[in-house]
Regions:
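C-terminal structural segment of proteins
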Residues: 1-157
């Protein structure tokens, strides 16, 4: 690895501000980013850790709307009782992602932002007609997922 500036954001607003510095990348579970950095496929100037931001964690169900925070682990998605009732297929799918280590560290936000063609969440979110909410806007899943490893995320989101 190489030198990188590490920041633990105290809020979503601080994370967004730090994301503007240099070639910063968000970090939560690190299941894709850290291996990419180790093999020098990614070389961010700054890592902005959002893994402990409560605003980005957890599952909320209100009527027919399910909201899952970007820093919510696959394990937490798979074991949330409210989600198991509201959308059992999504909870079950999350329980089958990777191995226990990946399920306990990997996050739904990281999986979605990476848009790996082998990942489960993109297809599930497309099928559900989901909306991805960033710090700046709301994006329909069919507009968010552009192609292999490509999303509709813009700089600073």
């Amino acid at each position: 690895m190489y030198s990188v500036n590490y920041h633990r954001a105290a809020s979503v607003a601080e994370a967004a501000k730090l994301l503007k510095s240099g070639d910063a990348k968000l970090l939560s579970g690190g299941m894709t980013l850290i291996p990419a950095m180790k093999t020098r496929l990614a070389a961010p100037s700054d890592l902005v850790d959002v893994s402990r931001l409560k605003d980005l964690q957890g599952v909320k169900v209100s009527g027919k709307t399910v909201t899952i925070g970007a820093a919510t682990t696959h394990y937490d998605v798979s074991n949330d009782e409210k989600l198991k009732k509201a959308c059992p297929a999504l909870a079950h799918m999350a329980s089958l992602i990777g191995d226990p280590a990946v399920r306990h560290k990997g996050t739904i936000g990281g999986s979605i932002a990476n848009n790996d063609p082998a990942a489960d969440y993109p297809a599930a979110l497309l099928a559900l007609g989901a909306t991805i909410v960033t710090n700046k806007r709301q994006i329909a899943a069919d507009k968010f997922f552009k192609g292999l490893f490509e999303t509709g995320l813009k700089e600073g989101e």
